[in-house]
Amino acid sequence: MVQVVLGEDEGIESALRRFKRQVSKAGILADVKRRRHFETPLEKKKRKRIATRRKRRFR
């Protein structure tokens, strides 16, 4: 779970920016989008295979 503790002199805008950055870094929104619809085992394998290819290409 992502938490942001507000400092004494910190504004809401900067805390919100920090929260958004932590959420995107944790991959929470990507996970929610992926789980929005049922994914068949074949689709899971295909997604993982594509992700593996991407990782290999950037090495």
From Swiss-Prot:
Belongs to the bacterial ribosomal protein bS21 family. It comes from Acaryochloris marina (strain MBIC 11017). This is Small ribosomal subunit protein bS21. InterPro entries: Ribosomal_bS21, Ribosomal_bS21_CS, Ribosomal_bS21_sf. Keywords: Ribonucleoprotein, Ribosomal protein. GO terms for biological process: translation. The gene is rpsU. Pfam families: Ribosomal_S21. GO terms for cellular component: ribonucleoprotein complex; ribosome.
